[in-house]
């Protein structure tokens, strides 16, 4: 199992790396060149940089990820593309995307978009908290434990 991270704007990269080091798992962070970093990372962490542009990281993840891998993303659309490949998908708030819940999530996203296009307002995400990070870490550890 490799852990892939949809890295653009992900608040849990460091948490994923911490857990992956403990469990001796490889991490692949896919992000745009805008987020290039010279920071030193553990040996098991690699970066794949993609051009700027909507969905460039998503398309690269779909290309690279394999059955049995784990993806960390908040992107419902990306989750829906990799679930049929047998990939486990975890949201940064700690809930797992599944074949059973993805259609409802996509439908909710669609209707929210319709409201916004008509000039309406929908609730945006709340700021990411330390409690969110703790919840995510526990969910990640549990999912990895069940999958190995």
From Swiss-Prot:
Transmembrane segment boundaries: none
InterPro entries xref list: UPF0178
Family as reported in the entry's similarity comment: Belongs to the UPF0178 family.
Protein name: UPF0178 protein EF_0842
Source organism (scientific name): Enterococcus faecalis (strain ATCC 700802 / V583)
């Amino acid at each position: 199992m490799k852990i892939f991270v949809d890295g653009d704007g992900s608040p849990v990269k460091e948490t994923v790396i911490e857990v992956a080091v403990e469990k001796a798992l490889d991490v692949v962070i896919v992000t745009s060149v805008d987020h290039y970093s010279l920071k030193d990372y553990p040996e098991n962490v690699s970066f794949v940089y993609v051009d700027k542009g909507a969905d460039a990281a998503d398309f690269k993840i779909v290309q690279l990820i394999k059955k049995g891998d784990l993806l960390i993303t908040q992107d419902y659309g990306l989750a829906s593309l990799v679930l049929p490949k047998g990939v486990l998908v975890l949201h940064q708030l700690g809930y797992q995307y599944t074949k059973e819940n993805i259609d409802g999530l996509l439908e909710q996203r669609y209707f929210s978009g319709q409201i916004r296009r008509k000039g309406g307002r929908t609730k945006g995400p709340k700021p990411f908290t330390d409690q969110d990070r703790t919840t995510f870490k526990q969910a990640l550890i549990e999912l990895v434990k069940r999958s190995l």
